[in-house]
């Protein structure tokens, strides 16, 4: 007897069959391959080209040396080093311009060292709160490269001169850093990219068609001051589009952070290595991202249309001493520079009129009106961009067509009597006899598995939030590994248990149907948000649903390969009767275990098929045809199909396990088509969004924001990422799930017990020192999250023996703790004398009240500083700065009044003259924002503080308290600024 005859269920190995080994191997390979590509895109920066391969006019070696020089020290606006950087930039610009002037064919270049513009404005108010007023003096450097199609006249030299022709292109970067960071990525790389753009577009052969303005702005870190005061320069009326280069991380790839519209975003496709998603822009719209960039000024105030490109990770180095050249690399610099070159070249070469038509707002430049767009990169090599309205139309169409196609297909299946889905049994004519089809098996399996596999990761998110909430700060991928591994193992375990007890050939069809329903609902929600709120972050749901629809349709089309239900039932009934007659003639009736494999316990046939009745004396001599997907013929009620023993073995070998016997004609390869239709696009789009979201938010805990939203995102995106496995996972062998179970156990233990911070992923603690010049006392304050803030303070020698006064911080879970610290030495008698002046001499101020009116003039000046401010216990109604410009586009006051006036000067030890007037409102004693008791004054009096700021942290010993904190704080702590100044000194005042 041959082996096949000995074991009728032996089947030849088919490498693409829907059986455990091919399913496990192929699915694992597909997921790993695409996931690795997605991870490589996020973790590996494209290498910088060699000098020989660099674009003509670009010198990366020079750019890197410029970055090293720029980041030699801290250079905030209120520092001497900032003046040095300003002078160095002018020198570098002039050198590049001289080189281009010596070459033939170079464009005209004009350099504006803007030391005239100034502006008074405000933050516009928040709800009913008083606003903050600002006076700022410009030290911006503006470089204009005249385009070949620009107005040849120097129109900016005329009184009220305006440019003719098409608008130019603005590329912006700020050259100031924070007082605690060297500014390599925030925004040194942007600055040196501007220098290289200047070299590139002044090189022969690269002359721009439209004018290009390079803005080296100063003062972004303190209040976007540099961009706001740029609005007072003539060039702000010339530019219609912009590219803003920023940094909110410390390397990696430069990400397209946000964009004003579809039309301008299309120019980003010129970038050699595009990277970004519309998700980040919607984060700003929804208020999830609180920090801002110069983008809001260029677009919101001036009306320019453009792009915001920024480094986004790791945020633990952002605004710290690790934002330096040592912690980044030339590859990241090249990525930003290549993006800037590609995008800018496209903008300055554009000949259309999209950015030159009139706008409805007369206060803004005539840059036209754009359309909301959707954009995302694919593996950092390709870039997709299209209108949000287009996606809305496609989504609505698909929401209607998808269910309609499946409904029509279901009707066709019912008409041809092959709709096994939702079919429990089939009646034989009008008789009471029925044959079981077991078509409901697996109907509710997928929603149960989907629910459990979603709930468990969410439960783990709660667990991490309670036990070790900040582990994601340093171990994002450990959290991802935990979530993904538990999802796959639980899904496999539940699917295998269900398949063991109730095997079903319809598992795939039912799984896809449920996923179709869930993604249909997701697309409805996404479409509503896109239409009503302009939110495009759910763009991936369209592609997700489209792929699910196609995969589901394949499962429905597969059913056409099955025998007609009536035909199957008649054949099963006949065979049952013949076998029952044969069995009744035996002396001994066999037990259920002795029955043939195709006879169920109730006598019904388990493997009914048109071709499987045993030959008898009455059997026709002609064997009937097999019923297959490709070769099916209908017959009358008396038509009978017969098979040889060999055919019977083939049929039985085509049935997997104990699944329904009618399933033997189902195609065995279509699962691969479904996998390839759905899995890659889901991994690419969902994986991209998930990684971008968690990468940008993994370190928000140090800012006082709850990390639960990060863990919740990991949990939900795990479900979205691996839901395409549900139709196949019951076929997996135990090897991969068991391995993932071990991964889950290991990562769970690690995530629960590991210390969340490290020298490579430090916790940010925010520093400020406040000096009361009236009594000479000072307090050092650190702001951070507990219990790590207390651990840091306990390591500081000057805090030993003192009880720190801790209060609720400015946001979320932040706590602020203060103690009496080492006195600062920010003011000296003269540059050559180390003797520190008494604190009472640091600020000079004079207040003169207008007789009979609630008006006063305040003159204030600080030693060794160019930044001061006035804080009022009750808001003033209005204020004016002597010699300042005002702009109705940037109101300087509001109905709520002004609680604080910030004063910035380009001149050291400047004297500001501020006129204020206030309403006659009674003042009740209470607690001020900083905890100091308010003074009880009459309704015609005004009280407050005169404060000056010191931010220069380049010389050791000037701020001993900061030096001490940096020296003794744990290695896993990074010190960042808490406010505009590192040291703030104040006098109280009362105007009577």
Swiss-Prot record:
Where, in residue ranges, is this chain on the Vacuolar side?
Answer: 46-390, 468-474, 530-533, 693-708, 758-992
Q: What does the record say about its membrane topology?
A: Multi-pass membrane protein
Q: Which residues are annotated as active site?
A: 220
State the function annotated in the UniProt record: May be involved in vacuolar sorting and osmoregulation.
**Glycosylation: which residues?**
59, 115, 118, 237, 805, 846, 954
> Which cofactors are reported in the record for this sequence?
Zn(2+)
- What sections of the protein cross the membrane? 25-45, 391-411, 447-467, 475-495, 509-529, 534-554, 672-692, 709-729, 737-757
Record keyword Ubl conjugation present? no
If you read the UniProt record, what top EC class would you report for this enzyme, in one word?
hydrolase
Q: Origin organism of this chain? A: Paracoccidioides brasiliensis (strain Pb03)
* Signal sequence extent: none
Enumerate the residues binding Zn(2+) 2: 186, 221, 319
UniProt subcellular location = Vacuole membrane
- For side Cytoplasmic, which residue ranges? 1-24, 412-446, 496-508, 555-671, 730-736
- What EC number(s) would the UniProt record show? 3.4.-.-
- Could you give a single Gene Ontology term from the biological process aspect? proteolysis
InterPro entries reported for this sequence: Fxna-like_M28_dom, M28_fam, Peptidase_M28, PFF1_C, PFF1_TM
List the protein's name: Vacuolar membrane protease
Gene Ontology molecular function: any one: metal ion binding
Query: What residues bind Zn(2+) 1, as annotated?
Result: 174, 186, 246
Q: Where do the segments described as Disordered lie?
A: 579-620
Keyword rRNA-binding annotated: no
Primary site of residence: membrane
GO CC terms of this entry: vacuolar membrane
Name the domain of life this protein comes from. Answer: Eukaryota
- Cofactor binding summary note: Binds 2 Zn(2+) ions per subunit.
User: Which terms are listed as keywords in the entry?
Assistant: Glycoprotein, Hydrolase, Membrane, Metal-binding, Metalloprotease, Protease, Transmembrane, Transmembrane helix, Vacuole, Zinc
């Amino acid at each position: 007897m041959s082996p096949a005859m000995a074991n009728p269920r032996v089947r030849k190995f088919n490498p693409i069959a829907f059986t455990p080994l091919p399913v496990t191997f192929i699915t694992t390979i597909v997921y790993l391959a695409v996931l690795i590509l997605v991870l490589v895109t996020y973790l590996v920066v494209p290498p910088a080209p060699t000098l020989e391969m660099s674009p003509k006019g670009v010198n990366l070696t020079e750019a890197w040396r410029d970055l090293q020089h720029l980041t030699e020290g801290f250079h905030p606006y209120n520092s001497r080093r900032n003046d040095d950087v300003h002078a160095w930039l002018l020198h570098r610009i002039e050198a590049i311009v001289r080189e281009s002037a010596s070459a033939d064919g170079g464009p005209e270049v004009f350099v504006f060292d803007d030391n005239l513009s100034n502006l008074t404005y405000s933050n516009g108010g928040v709800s009913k709160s008083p606003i903050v007023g600002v006076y700022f003096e410009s030290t911006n450097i503006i470089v204009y490269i005249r385009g070949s199609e620009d107005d040849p006249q120097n129109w900016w030299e005329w009184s009220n001169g305006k440019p003719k022709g098409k608008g130019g292109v603005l590329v912006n970067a700020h050259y100031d850093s924070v007082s605690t960071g060297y500014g390599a990525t925030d925004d040194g790389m942007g600055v040196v990219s501007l220098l290289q753009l200047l070299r590139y577009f002044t090189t022969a052969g690269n002359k721009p068609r439209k004018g290009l303005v390079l803005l080296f702005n100063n003062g972004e870190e303190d209040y976007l001051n540099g961009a706001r005061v740029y609005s007072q320069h003539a060039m702000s009326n010339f530019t219609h589009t912009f590219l803003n280069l920023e940094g909110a991380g410390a390397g990696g790839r430069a990400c397209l952070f946000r964009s004003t519209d579809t039309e301008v975003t299309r120019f980003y496709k010129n970038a050699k290595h595009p990277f970004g998603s519309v998700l980040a822009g919607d984060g700003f719209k929804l208020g999830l991202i609180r920090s801002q960039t110069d983008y809001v000024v260029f677009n919101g105030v001036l009306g320019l249309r453009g792009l915001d490109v920024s480094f986004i990770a790791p945020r633990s180095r952002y605004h710290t001493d690790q934002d330096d050249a040592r912690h980044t690399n030339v590859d990241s610099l090249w990525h930003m520079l290549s993006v800037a070159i590609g995008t800018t070249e496209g903008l300055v070469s554009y000949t259309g009129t999209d950015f030159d038509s009139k706008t409805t707002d007369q206060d803004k430049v005539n840059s036209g009106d754009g359309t909301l767009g959707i954009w995302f990169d694919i593996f950092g090599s390709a870039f997709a961009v299209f209108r949000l309205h287009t996606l809305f139309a496609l989504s609505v169409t698909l929401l209607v067509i998808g269910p309609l196609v499946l409904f029509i297909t279901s009707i066709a299946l019912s008409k041809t009597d092959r709709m096994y889905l939702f079919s429990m049994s089939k009646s034989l004519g009008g008789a009471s006899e029925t044959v079981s089809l077991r078509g409901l098996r697996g109907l509710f399996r997928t929603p149960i598995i989907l629910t459990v596999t979603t709930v468990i990761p969410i439960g783990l998110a709660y667990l991490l939030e309670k036990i070790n909430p900040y582990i994601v700060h340093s171990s994002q991928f450990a959290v991802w590994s935990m979530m993904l591994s538990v999802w796959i193992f639980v899904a496999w375990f539940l699917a295998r248990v269900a398949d063991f007890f109730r095997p079903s050939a319809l598992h795939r069809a039912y799984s896809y149907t449920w996923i179709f329903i869930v993604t249909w609902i997701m697309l409805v929600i996404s479409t509503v948000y896109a239409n009503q709120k302009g939110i495009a972050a759910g763009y991936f749901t369209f592609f997700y649903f489209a792929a699910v629809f196609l995969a589901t349709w394949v499962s429905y089309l597969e059913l056409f390969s099955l025998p007609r239900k009536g035909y199957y039932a008649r054949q099963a009934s006949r065979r049952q009767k013949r076998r029952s007659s044969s069995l009744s003639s035996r002396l001994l009736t066999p037990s259920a275990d002795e029955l043939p494999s195709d006879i169920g316990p109730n006598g019904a046939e388990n493997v009914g098929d048109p071709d499987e009745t045993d030959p008898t004396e009455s059997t026709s001599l002609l064997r009937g045809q097999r019923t297959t997907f490709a070769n099916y013929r209908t017959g009358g009620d008396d038509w009978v199909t017969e098979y040889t023993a060999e055919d019977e073995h083939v049929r039985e070998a085509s049935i997997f396990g104990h699944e329904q016997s009618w399933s033997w004609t189902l195609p065995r390869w279509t699962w691969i088509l479904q996998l390839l239709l759905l899995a890659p696009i889901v991994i690419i789009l969902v994986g991209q969004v998930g990684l971008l979201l968690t990468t940008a938010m993994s370190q928000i805990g140090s800012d006082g924001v709850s990390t639960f939203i990060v863990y919740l995102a990991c949990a939900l995106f795990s479900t979205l990422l691996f839901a395409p496995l549900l139709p196949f996972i019951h076929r997996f062998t135990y090897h991969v799930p068991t391995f993932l179970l071990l991964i889950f156990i290991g990562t769970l233990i690690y995530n629960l017990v590991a210390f969340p911070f490290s020298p490579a992923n430090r916790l940010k603690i925010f520093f400020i020192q406040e000096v009361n010049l009236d009594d000479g006392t000072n307090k050092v304050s650190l702001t951070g999250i507990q219990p790590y803030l207390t651990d840091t303070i306990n390591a500081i020698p000057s805090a030993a023996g003192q009880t720190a006064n801790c209060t609720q911080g400015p946001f979320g879970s932040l706590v602020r703790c203060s103690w009496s610290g080492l006195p600062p030495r920010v003011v000296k008698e003269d540059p050559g004398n180390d003797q520190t002046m008494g604190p009472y001499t640091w600020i000079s101020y004079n207040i003169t009240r207008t007789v009979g009116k609630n008006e006063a003039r305040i003159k204030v000046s600080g030693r060794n500083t160019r930044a001061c401010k006035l804080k009022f216990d009750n808001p003033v109604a209005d204020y004016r700065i002597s010699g300042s410009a005002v702009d109705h586009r940037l109101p300087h006051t509001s109905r709520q009044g002004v609680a604080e006036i910030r004063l910035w000067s380009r001149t050291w030890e400047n004297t500001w003259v501020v006129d204020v007037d206030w309403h006659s409102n009674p003042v009740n004693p209470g607690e001020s924002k900083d905890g100091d008791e308010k003074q009880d004054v009459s309704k015609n009096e005004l009280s407050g503080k005169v404060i000056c700021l010191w931010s220069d942290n380049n010389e050791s010993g000037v701020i001993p308290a900061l030096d001490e904190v940096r020296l003794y704080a744990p290695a896993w702590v990074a010190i960042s600024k808490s406010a505009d100044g590192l040291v703030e000194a104040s006098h109280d005042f009362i105007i009577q």
